[in-house]
Amino acid sequence: MSRYRGPRLKIVRKLGDLPGLTSKINKNLQLAEQNKGKKSTKTKLSQYGIRLQEKQKLKYNYGVTEKQLLLYIRKARTIKGSTGQMLLQYLEMRLDNTVFRLGLAPTIAGARQLVNHGHIMVNNRIVTIPSYKCKPKDILSIRNNNKSRNLVLNNLASPSVSKIPNHLLLKKDTLTATVNGIVERKSIPLEINELLVVEYYSRQT
């Protein structure tokens, strides 16, 4: 199944704040609420529907396919500890998400384009794989050409850039960043109940 490329407002109306999907979330949600009208009511979800909704939050926020999400679930199950938290770590430590969390792109989709087009380097090598798993001590930098630097500088100047999490360090003067560790659960801005996602897949696999 391919990634969603349809209207983002439709998704945020249904699932709520998805910081990785759109940087205009507050404005979009406000418009959505105005358009719904006072008479509209939400259908009460079943337990399955609630679990499905939480799964959809991950899928749309991180821009991954169903196949990729299932693969991350299977990997997370093989590691000692909370499967849900390991799942979030896999998603958060992806290169495209790391570029986004550093503020080098306004959305994860935008960060994925930077990676795909060869603008991002990891440890002095161009990496064009968005799913590349960033590791502690990895050093990210921008390809040394005007186009790459200008793209990133424009993104950094955007007021929508959120606070950089503690496991990442960005040096704006050199446009380099260091991965200092693994992301902490409290640093993840997405409102998600990862346990419900694990429960959803336990009934699917």
UniProtKB/Swiss-Prot annotation:
Protein known as: Small ribosomal subunit protein uS4c
SMART domains found in the cross-reference section: Ribosomal_S4, S4
A single MF term (Gene Ontology): rRNA binding
Protein family membership: Belongs to the universal ribosomal protein uS4 family.
Role: One of the primary rRNA binding proteins, it binds directly to 16S rRNA where it nucleates assembly of the body of the 30S subunit.
Parts forming coiled coils: none
Biological process, per Gene Ontology: ribosomal small subunit biogenesis; translation
Stretches assigned to the S4 RNA-binding domain: 93-156
GO cellular component labels: chloroplast; small ribosomal subunit
PANTHER family with a match to the protein in the record: 30S 40S RIBOSOMAL PROTEIN, SMALL RIBOSOMAL SUBUNIT PROTEIN US4M
Cystines in this chain: none
Main location: plastid
Record key words, sorted: Chloroplast, Plastid, Ribonucleoprotein, Ribosomal protein, RNA-binding, rRNA-binding
Pfam families: Ribosomal_S4 (PF00163), S4 (PF01479)
Organism: Mesostigma viride (Green alga)
Localization of this protein: Plastid, Chloroplast
Matching CDD domains: S4
